[in-house]
């Protein structure tokens, strides 16, 4: 296993980072597709649609063509929330990472580098909400290249964010992840994050029953030990 070190993002990392984001989102489409196929409304469509068409038209061929054509449409639906997220992100905070994450104190973006390749990343931005009683940091875009997983890189990146939050005087760290991202949820919970709720991040996610789970990590000011 090649050594890996975590450092701040540089502009020369952009191509690597965008690639990680795109690949990381795309790899969730198959699991989303399998989940979509199990939904009651999908089963009704897959079974009832062709049957209804057969009864109306009397054509087995037409019913078969309709049934087969449903699968590309469902695959499109499974991919859409993830492509939508990538497009949205590349138009907002990831459009200029240096400006969004490194131009002001209290925010940062890190990459994990191994053998001169960026194999992981994570960002952190302050939560701008005047109604909050506590100073809160939000973790964004935790990704590790598929070939470098199970090496502790994701945990090291999360620890980097938590330590940064301590150093900057934050009281809480929050993040969002999908219900379909089981390994990510297990990681966060093993590190002390607690669920606070769930929602849908876009209409496409609602269509495929893809919930976003919200987590929080409390950093009491009196706690000075290691993570």
From Swiss-Prot:
InterPro entries the UniProt entry points to: Acyl_CoA_acyltransferase (IPR016181), GNAT_dom (IPR000182), NAT_camello-type (IPR050769)
Keyword terms: Acyltransferase, Endoplasmic reticulum, Membrane, Signal-anchor, Transferase, Transmembrane, Transmembrane helix
Upregulating conditions: Up-regulated by ceramides.
Enzyme class: transferase
Keyword Transferase belongs to the record: yes
Lumenal topological domain residue ranges: 64-227
Gene3D superfamilies assigned to the protein according to its UniProt record, in alphabetical order: 3.40.630.30
Impact when changing residue 143 to S: No effect on the cysteine S-conjugate N-acetyltransferase activity
Catalytic activity: L-lysyl-[protein] + acetyl-CoA = N(6)-acetyl-L-lysyl-[protein] + CoA + H(+); an S-substituted L-cysteine + acetyl-CoA = an N-acetyl-L-cysteine-S-conjugate + CoA + H(+)
Pathway listed: Sulfur metabolism; glutathione metabolism
Expressing tissues: Preferentially expressed in liver and kidney. Also detected in brain (at protein level).
Entry-linked SUPFAM superfamilies: Acyl-CoA N-acyltransferases (Nat)
Any GO molecular function: L-cysteine-S-conjugate N-acetyltransferase activity
Listed result of changing residue 190 to A: Exhibits reduced protein-lysine N6-acetyltransferase activity
Pfam families, alphabetized: Acetyltransf_1 (PF00583)
Cytoplasmic side: 1-42
Principal subcellular localisation of the protein: endoplasmic reticulum
Domain of life of the native organism: Eukaryota
Assigned EC number: 2.3.1.-, 2.3.1.80
Bilayer-spanning residue ranges: 43-63
Statement: the UniProt record of this protein carries the keyword Membrane: yes
CDD domains the UniProt entry points to: NAT_SF (cd04301)
Domain N-acetyltransferase: 61-220
GO biological process: amyloid fibril formation; glutathione metabolic process; peptidyl-lysine N6-acetylation; positive regulation of gene expression
Function: Endoplasmic reticulum (ER)-membrane-bound lysine N-acetyltransferase catalyzing the N6-acetylation of lysine residues in the lumen of the ER in various proteins, including PROM1 and BACE1, using acetyl-CoA as acetyl donor. Thereby, may regulate apoptosis through the acetylation and the regulation of the expression of PROM1. May also regulate amyloid beta-peptide secretion through acetylation of BACE1 and the regulation of its expression in neurons. N(6)-lysine acetylation in the ER maintains protein homeostasis and regulates reticulophagy.
Name under which the protein is recorded: N-acetyltransferase 8
